[in-house]
Curated annotation (Swiss-Prot):
SMART domains: EFG_C, EFG_IV. Residues 8-288 form the tr-type G domain. GTP binds at residues 17-24, 86-90, 140-143. This is Elongation factor G. Belongs to the TRAFAC class translation factor GTPase superfamily. Classic translation factor GTPase family. EF-G/EF-2 subfamily. The lineage of its organism: Bacteria, Pseudomonadati, Pseudomonadota, Alphaproteobacteria, Hyphomicrobiales. PROSITE patterns: G_TR_1, G_TR_2. InterPro entries: EFG_II, EFG_III, EFG_III/V, EFG_IV, EFG_V, EFG_V-like, EFTu-like_2, G_TR_CS. Catalyzes the GTP-dependent ribosomal translocation step during translation elongation. During this step, the ribosome changes from the pre-translocational (PRE) to the post-translocational (POST) state as the newly formed A-site-bound peptidyl-tRNA and P-site-bound deacylated tRNA move to the P and E sites, respectively. Catalyzes the coordinated movement of the two tRNA molecules, the mRNA and conformational changes in the ribosome. It comes from Allorhizobium ampelinum (strain ATCC BAA-846 / DSM 112012 / S4). Keywords: Cytoplasm, Elongation factor, GTP-binding, Nucleotide-binding, Protein biosynthesis. It comes from the Bacteria.
Length: 699
């Protein structure tokens, strides 16, 4: 089966916004007008097609990114293929949005015309900046009371530090909103209410908007000619670019992320959606317009590029795992190069495992279509993959590449979680396992002593959302304990310990003597074992027992029972007995030897230090820095980003609980922060004494 659409006619884009700016409604209208939906799904009546989990339809919010493929004929009469990702905007925790942005070529940022740029808009905008995603802006809800298009334009400049190129002006506002002025064609589009937005009339610009239209067209041309020397020169000499040239310049500037074309309308009242679809065709990039994806060649370890070309070897990135009630586990993948056939064997280069593609599905929200083949630029859902998780690369087994090594750091915070009722017990286990499969930075374990279920993650917020998703998606009610920080212990100086284990009680006894040097491991946090035995004072077959004995006690340090990091042990001497010695005897001896030595080798408590990035408007910088210092934070630096200031700091995790609430009240909800584990650092002695007192009583 040959490719149906040329790759230059693909548009892979997402819709990003603050909660309630109308993302799902806008996507619904796109599906309706592009012919994928026979009935307009309304979030208000629980029929939206993109929101296909029951909980989403009940609540009118989008929980998971649903991917859908649809088609649209642009103004030039050419059909384009759209792969759309609908992303959630309702959570602080925006890993879903990040995952989507990594595999998209462009995005539409939705604004609520009443609220303008809201805090979550700032967050997703910054994420898109990070991945350099070309964006257009759609000022939605123009029919709402208090809708103000011009204020939204101003807020894009002041709040986001971005340049919006206004492409349309609204005709009327609030209940009087009728249509838009097209600033390129210089005409008016007025929608007919009775046609569900399918029909509109092209008329002259209303008299009261003529002057404003001329002013904004002038601004539009001034902005776009700046990116092209020849156009700029012509403009300064009084030669105006024609409409095709203006469109070409808008496209170039959008793809180069120099500015963002801005449109307006009301998806709910079916006005302004079709021109937005035309704009997706005209201004957002195809996979050919963006730089080739870089990867690591598995054979040579050198950097290579994969281009969006069917003739290149297959490479794709798994960006989301979803559980489908009918098909089971689905792995959503973006194909960057080559082509994929159903039943093909692919290599997961991250897990170093081969996978077979069972079924290949084209997703339309909650309905699915089996396909035999997929090509570069496609976003597909694969069924039947056993090993693959988020961030894995799948590729041609003969041309192996790793597209993006994703680091999933060790969890730094854990809480005990218990089901509220007996009936929730089994459901909770299932829910936690499913959530762990979807999110590699989340872990589940059982505490051996108490039998409690412990969930661990990257921060307080992360675990809050896991518990919330469990309740919402799996209907499991659970009680959670107080968060616990994952402290560690280490030793700070060299110490030599000589220990003899002797046990005689009739029959065969036990005997083993070990002399071991313990010291900090200069190579990192791992445990390192070495043997310098010469002359057979400890026979070769007993040496693994010595190593095993030490390893068995590293999980509980001498200060407060936390796991130990960065220990090096060197066995230098010992003694054995022909009859009474055994591997077990040497294991017991080395275990006791280490316990004795750890107390004398300068045992020290370590705490997880988080790399914290706060993005705040300038007005709040002093307060934010003062607050971080009061949390034992070390400021690493600050820089300007647009009109915001980015503050980087290392802060102990123990002092970051409830930080999100503090930051919100400090900045009136306008600052955001992100936090990742960075390294373990010694705990100051006064704090260490408190921690030891608290945890020693529990051990």
């Amino acid at each position: 089966m040959a490719r149906e659409y040329k790759i230059e006619d693909y548009r892979n884009f997402g819709i990003m916004a603050h909660i309630d700016a109308g993302k799902t409604t806008t996507t619904e209208r796109i599906l309706y007008y592009t012919g994928k939906s026979h009935k307009i799904g309304e979030v208000h009546d629980g029929a939206a097609t993109m929101d296909w989990m029951e909980q989403e339809q009940e609540r009118g919010i989008t929980i998971t990114s649903a991917a859908t493929t649809t088609y649209w004929k642009g103004r030039d009469g050419k059909m384009r293929r759209f792969n759309i990702i609908d992303t959630p905007g309702h959570v602080d925790f925006t890993i879903e949005v990040e995952r989507s942005l990594r595999v998209l070529d462009g995005a539409i940022a939705l604004l609520d015309a009443n609220a303008g740029v809201e805090p979550q808009t700032e967050t997703v905008w910054r994420q898109a900046e990070k991945y350099n995603v070309p964006r257009m802006i759609f000022c939605n809800k123009m029919d709402k009371t208090g809708a103000d298009f011009y204020r939204s334009v101003e807020m894009i400049k002041t709040r986001l530090g971005a340049t919006a190129v206004v492409m349309q002006l609204p005709i009327g506002a609030e209940t009087e909103f009728k249509g838009v002025v097209d600033l390129i064609e210089m005409n008016a589009l007025v929608w007919r209410d009775e046609s569900l937005g399918a029909a509109w009339d092209v008329t002259e610009i209303p008299d009261d908007l003529k002057e404003k239209a001329v002013e904004y067209r002038e601004k539009l041309i001034e902005t776009v000619v700046e990116i092209d020397e020849q156009a700029m020169e012509d403009y300064l000499n009084g030669i105006m670019p024609d409409n095709d040239k203006i469109r070409a310049l808008v496209r170039q500037g959008t793809i180069e992320v120099k500015f963002h074309p801005m449109f307006c309308g009301t998806a709910f009242k079916n006005k302004g959606v079709q021109p937005l679809l035309d704009a997706v065709c005209e201004y957002l990039p195809s996979p050919l317009d963006i730089p080739a994806i870089k990867g690591i060649d598995v054979k040579t370890d050198g950097e290579i590029e994969r281009h969006p070309d069917d003739a290149e070897p297959l490479s794709m990135l798994a960006f989301k795992i979803m559980n489908d009630p009918f098909v089971g586990s689905l792995t959503f993948c973006r194909i960057y190069s080559g082509k994929l056939e159903k039943g093909a064997s692919v290599m997961n280069t991250v897990k170093e495992k081969r996978e077979r593609v069972g079924r290949m599905l084209q997703m339309h929200s909650n309905s699915r279509e089996d396909i035999e083949e997929a090509f570069a630029g496609d976003i597909v859902a694969l069924a039947g993959l056993k090993e693959s998780t988020t961030g894995d690369t799948l590729c041609d087994p003969l041309n192996q590449v790793i597209l993006e090594r994703m680091e999933f750091p060790e969890p730094v915070i854990q809480i005990a979680i218990e089901p509220k009722t007996k009936g929730d017990q089994e459901k909770m286990g299932l829910a936690l396992n499913r959530l762990a499969a979807e999110d590699p930075s989340f872990r589940v374990k059982t505490d051996q002593e108490s039998g409690q279920t412990i969930i661990a993650g990257m921060g307080e917020l992360h675990l809050d959302i896991i518990v919330d998703r469990m309740r919402r998606e799996f209907k499991v009610e659970a009680t959670v304990g107080a968060p616990q920080v994952a402290y560690r212990e280490t030793i700070t100086r060299q110490h030599e310990e000589d220990y003899t284990h002797k046990k005689q009680s009739g029959g065969t006894g036990q005997f083993a003597r070990v002399k071991i040097i313990f010291e900090p491991n200069p190579e990192g946090d791992e445990f390192k074992f070495d043997s310098k035995i010469v002359g057979g004072s400890v026979p070769k077959e007993y040496i693994p027992g010595v190593q095993k004995g030490i390893e068995s006690v590293l999980s509980s340090g001498p200060l407060a029972g936390f796991p130990m990091l960065g220990v090096k042990a060197t066995l230098i001497d010992g003694a054995y007995h022909d009859v009474d010695s055994s591997v077990l005897a040497f294991e017991i001896a080395s275990r006791a030897c280490f316990r004795e030595a750890a107390k004398k080798a300068g045992a020290q408590l370590l705490e997880p230090m988080m790399k914290v990035e706060v993005v705040t408007p300038e007005d709040y910088v002093g307060d934010v820095i003062g607050d971080l210092n009061s949390r034992r934070g070390q400021i690493q630096g600050q820089e300007s980003r647009g009109i915001a200031v980015v503050i980087n700091a290392h802060v102990p995790l123990a002092n970051m609980f409830k930080y999100v609430d503090n930051l919100r009240s400090m900045s009136q909800g306008r600052a955001q922060y992100s936090m990742v584990f960075d390294h373990y650092s010694p705990v100051p002695s006064n704090v260490a004494a408190e921690i030891q007192a608290k945890y020693s009583g529990q051990k």
